[in-house]
Design a protein with these regions (language model features):
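Conserved short beta-strand edge segments in small beta-sheet-based binding/regulatory domains
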Residues: 77-90
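Short amphipathic alpha-helices in soluble, non-transmembrane regions
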Residues: 29-33, 68-76
Length: 97
């Protein structure tokens, strides 16, 4: 089967998150995001520790990205830092924070 062209693959958004709990594991964060983002497509890519908090990067569709950001920002323990169509830019921005 032929590979889909770039235009037919759909657009994604990468969202950089800040997590207050510096001891949260990847599994715990996945469960937390599952509860918050029910019905929305997402995938956890990176989870790194900074000074007294952790940062993560999730991938979501362009169509769901606004709703996903709103749901994440509606909680006290999670907040979005940046959003982009390229993971490289999100990684650069969250490491500069």
């Amino acid at each position: 089967m032929a590979k889909l062209t770039k235009a037919k693959r759909g657009k994604n958004r990468w969202i950089g998150l800040s997590i207050r709990d510096s001891d949260i594991s990847r599994t715990e964060l996945s469960h937390l995001l599952e509860a918050r983002l029910q019905g929305k497509g997402w995938k956890l890519f990176d989870l790194q520790k900074h000074e007294n908090y952790k940062v993560a990067i999730i991938k979501t569709t362009l169509e769901d990205s606004s709703e996903v950001r709103d749901r994440i920002n509606s909680t006290d323990d999670l907040s979005t830092i940046t959003t982009s169509g390229k993971i490289r830019l999100v990684r650069a921005r969250i490491t500069d924070e």
